[in-house]
Regions:
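Helix N-terminus capping/helix-initiation residues
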Residues: 46-47, 68, 173
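Short, cationic Gly/His-enriched loop motifs
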Residues: 80-103, 107-186
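Generic serine detector
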Residues: 13-16, 55, 74, 106, ...
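Short helix-coil boundary/hinge micro-motifs
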Residues: 1-43, 58-95, 99, 117-118
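Cysteine-rich micro-motifs
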Residues: 44-63, 166-168
Length: 186
């Protein structure tokens, strides 16, 4: 005998990242709402069979180098990562920052980043997006033309700081960044 739809409310499962989820609303097999049982309590619409399979994606699971996640915007929407099938430039900036600090291959190529970290807030892409306009040089970054190379720097403003955060970071041209690196190495 099949369970009634109301009997499925409260049913628990674990997703592929090990996060517990609970059905909080069951409309039918094709429309259920689950709440993840972590500090964020994200609610996601999915299908019952996906829930049973454990394939429901939690926006706060650490899917980027085992430290970063996409999160949700303040309006509850997923942050934009691609536009017309191409990674959004803001996502590329965020992902590159995470990769420099936590990617094994990147750390082998550039061991100077071995002590660098990303602040807890910015490990969530949605938070990084929210803070972007607060970063010094944001206008340069957002208005750069194709061919301009604008980079996120933690050293210039942070006096050689090892932490990526809004207080330490600024956007600068690649050429100014290289000049600053040479100046600091003297």
């Amino acid at each position: 005998m099949r369970a009634k739809r109301t009997d499925r409310i409260g049913e628990k499962s674990i997703n592929s990242y090990g996060t517990e989820m609970i059905i909080i609303e069951y409309c039918n097999e094709k429309e259920i709402y689950v709440e993840f049982q972590d500090e964020y309590k994200a609610i996601v619409k999915t299908r019952y069979w996906i829930f049973k399979q454990g394939s429901v994606a939690n926006p706060y699971d650490k899917t980027v180098y085992n430290v970063g996640c996409l999160g949700l915007m303040s309006n509850g929407e997923k942050p934009i990562t691609k536009v017309n099938g191409v990674h959004d430039f803001r996502y590329v900036t965020w992902h590159g920052m995470i990769e420099r600090c936590y990617g094994e291959r990147s750390l082998k190529l550039k061991p100077t980043y071995k002590d660098a970290e990303v602040c807890d807030r910015w490990l969530v892409y949605a938070n990084f997006l929210e803070d972007l306009p607060l970063i010094e040089g944001y206008e340069l970054y957002i208005n750069s033309k194709r061919g301009d190379y604008i980079v996120l720097d933690k050293d210039i403003k942070g006096n050689g700081a090892k932490l990526y955060c809004v207080e330490n970071c600024c956007f600068v041209t690649q050429s100014n960044n290289v000049k600053e690196i040479h100046y600091r190495q003297k």
